[in-house]
A protein has these predicted regions:
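Extracellular parallel beta-helix/beta-solenoid repeat domains
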Residues: 23-324
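Bacterial N-terminal signal peptides that target proteins for export
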Residues: 1-9
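Aromatic (phenylalanine/tyrosine) cluster motif
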Residues: 4, 18-21, 44
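Bacterial N-terminal signal peptides
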Residues: 9-19
Length: 324
């Protein structure tokens, strides 16, 4: 047992040392997500806005730091009440800096949360998730410095979020932006993505009718924007497919794109995950078909430099791809 403890401690020390050295040497972007997730997770303080009592709240940081620059998770969440979900809306956070992450959620923090999974086993899940989740949130003119966690996570059912003129830096063990199942109608505009990510920059996972326009993807070694449906993970049935999204006038730096990665990939998974059958037994959604159905999306005016045959991969159907 003593030897095990010593060995475990040594591993943690090595990983911690590797983290700081890798950041200094700009190695993290070349490190895949599964390795980055082994690194020690830093401790975050929480700043929480919960329920309708926060409706219309404006947090103007006036160019300064949220929480004095301490590593912080800003949480905007609904409150589970006896009579239903008490939902916050029309919150604005703007004009400042955040060291950490922002997560917005209702039914659950991610697609595998217990209440999300329970709801997904019945028809009408998308509507329930959206009714329960925060809506009409504005994040504007923010500088978000990531540290290990995904810096912006819109959880199942979140709708009507606008992310405008924000800059994302730092590093993430996963993606930079995650649009989770059953979310939709969100807008990401005029943002700059320079996070050293262990995966694609932006995951559109069963999220629909979003607009992603006029953004700059400067760190896209493992891909830029991927549309898919994360079939079966955690036993949750995914109902909505990543359809009706508009991806327009974005710039992608393709210089360091890794083999097998793409600037934009419509249908990046298609059931190629070991857990895809974990939601079996229900007559709808990903339970009956593990494919992504990344269909009916519009891509236009996007710029990929240098030019590459890995700019766009279309594994969906009826997508309109109009490039400059």
């Amino acid at each position: 047992m003593g030897r095990f403890i010593v060995n475990s401690t040594l591993v943690l020390v090595v990983l911690t040392t590797f983290t700081f050295f890798a950041m200094g040497q700009d190695w993290l972007p070349q490190t895949p997500s599964f390795l980055l997730k082994l690194l020690p997770k830093p401790k975050f303080e929480k700043h929480t806005l919960e329920g309708s009592e926060e409706n219309g709240r404006v947090i103007d940081l006036q160019g300064g730091w949220l929480n004095e620059g301490k590593l912080t998770e800003m949480v905007i969440r609904s409150k589970d009440m006896e009579k239903g979900w008490d939902v916050p809306e029309r919150i604005k956070i703007r004009n400042g800096r955040i060291r950490g992450s922002i997560r917005i959620y209702g039914l659950g923090v991610n697609g595998e949360a217990a209440k999300v999974r329970e709801s997904s086993h019945r028809e009408g899940h998308t509507a329930r998730a959206q009714v329960a989740a925060p809506r009409a949130i504005l994040l504007e003119d923010l500088q978000i410095e990531a540290n290990h966690r995904i810096p912006l996570y819109l959880s199942p059912g979140v709708t009507g979020v606008t992310v405008k003129n924000c800059t994302f830096t730092g590093w993430s063990a996963s993606t930079t932006v995650y649009l989770d199942a059953e979310s939709g109608g969100n807008r990401i505009e005029g943002c700059t993505f320079e996070v050293r990510s262990g995966r694609e920059v932006m995951a559109v996972d069963g999220s629909a009718t979003n607009t992603i326009i006029g953004n700059r993807f400067f760190q896209a070694r493992y891909g830029g924007i991927y549309l898919y449906r994360n079939c079966g993970e955690g036993g949750t049935v995914r109902h909505q497919a990543p359809q009706g999204n508009v991806i327009e006038n974005n710039f992608f730096n393709m210089k360091d794109l890794r083999s097998g990665s793409y600037g934009i990939w419509l249908g990046s998974r298609q059931g190629r995950r070991s857990y895809c059958e974990d939601d079996a037994g229900y007559p709808f959604g990903s339970s009956i078909d593990n494919r992504d159905f990344a269909d009916h999306n519009i891509l236009r005016g996007n710029i990929f430099q240098p030019a590459s045959d890995h700019a766009v991969r279309d594994d969906g159907s009826d997508n309109r791809i109009l490039q400059k």
